[in-house]
Amino acid sequence: MHNTKCNVLIVGFGPTGSVLANLLSKYNITIHILEKENEIYNLPRAVHFDDEIMRTFKSIGIFKKFLKKTIINKGTKFVDEYDNLILDWPRPKKITENGFYPSYRFHQPDLEKILRKNL
């Protein structure tokens, strides 16, 4: 085992770990990341985020790069296995107080690539 000092150890390098690494790097905090996978998983597990997350993306410097990879989400419909509507969740189409739309759709592997390249 190799002993190396760091201020923060991040276990997991998915979107949450990657955002945390980007935030901490802005404060010159030494981080080490442990991730069991060698490559980014090519299928999305998360597909939506809101204006608060976009504000965070702006603060870590990926807003403009990532905006090109998003779709403004005008709403979502949830259906059951028989295609019966369970929930119709329309989203406002106006900019929030944070300066962004309230709902975005995205492809998670694209986000992870941008977050990792930003470090």
Please give the residue ranges for each predicted region.
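Beta1/beta-strand and adjacent pyrophosphate-binding region of the FAD-binding site
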Residues: H2-T16, H32
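Residue-level preference for beta-strand/loop junctions
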Residues: H2-T4, S25, T70
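Conserved functional loop/turn residues at catalytic and ligand-binding sites
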Residues: G12, N28, G61
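Glycine-rich FAD pyrophosphate-binding loop
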Residues: L23-R45
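Active-site-adjacent segment of FAD-dependent monooxygenases/related oxidoreductases
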Residues: L43-R45, D50-N118
